[in-house]
Amino acid sequence: MKQKVVSIGDINVANDLPFVLFGGMNVLESRDLAMRICEHYVTVTQKLGIPYVFKASFDKANRSSIHSYRGPGLEEGMKIFQELKQQFGVKVITDVHEASQAQPVSEVVDVIQLPAFLARQTDLVEAMARTGAVINVKKPQFVSPGQMGNIVEKFKEAGNDQVILCDRGSNFGYDNLVVDMLGINVMVQATGGHPVIFDVTHALQCRDPFGAASGGRRAQVAELARAGMAVGLAGLFIEAHPEPNSAKCDGPSALPLDKLEPFLVQMKAIDDLVKSFPALDTSK
């Protein structure tokens, strides 16, 4: 199967190309922290020769508790993203939660993300598609890999085939996620070769059934990421924080920022190795 290439400016994303890093912080906590985290990602990825897109949310509209921090909002968030782009020359990805947000967000960032909980909302899909922007679709925890073909088809019918898919695990009983590594290629097959990336950060979530915020398994980030990279990915999605235990959202799943470089050294080594192998058809 020929692999589809989705271009984010001068960055090409495809399952058979060197992996692209989508990373940054879960939610914009402050302008200064965003600058610090983005600068570190840019420095490390340039050193290692890894294509990079900065990620952060301007509004976490789906927090479990009404008292949880959501972010600076649309207007302030776009100002921060514009400054990051000007300062570091970086591409930016962020998520939208309402159809009305799609157009103004697409005028600032390079990739707009469809959250997992909203991935089947047709009005939102159509609004995002109409922007013409590159789209990243998070696979819902409750949707099988093969069903992702239907979501991509919605985007295509609405006039946009520049779609990346992102696996972030599947429900395994209550309040737990597992990642089916076979499902990554199922998504590739179901969508006719669209790029698939792996969100290792959110795949590490493990909830307290009575808690107001997600727990996580940060200590296992490297082993889960290694497993994903061994499959052969178009990209890896990883959030980091200088003080994960103090992060305002998903700190228990965030990579300590000072571990980013050694972490990415391992990921790049695996990606280079896996993609150096010739294709091996074991279906016959």
From Swiss-Prot:
Compartment(s) of residence: Cytoplasm
Enzyme class: transferase
Protein family (similarity comment): Belongs to the KdsA family.
SUPFAM superfamilies noted in UniProt: Aldolase
Keyword annotations: Cytoplasm, Lipopolysaccharide biosynthesis, Transferase
Native source species: Yersinia pestis
Name of protein: 2-dehydro-3-deoxyphosphooctonate aldolase
Reactions catalysed according to its record: D-arabinose 5-phosphate + phosphoenolpyruvate + H2O = 3-deoxy-alpha-D-manno-2-octulosonate-8-phosphate + phosphate
PANTHER family given in the database record: PHOSPHO-2-DEHYDRO-3-DEOXYHEPTONATE ALDOLASE
Record EC number: 2.5.1.55
Lineage, uppermost ranks: Bacteria, Pseudomonadati, Pseudomonadota, Gammaproteobacteria, Enterobacterales
HAMAP family recorded: KDO8P_synth
Record flagged with keyword DNA-binding: no
A GO CC annotation given for this chain: cytosol
GO biological process: keto-3-deoxy-D-manno-octulosonic acid biosynthetic process
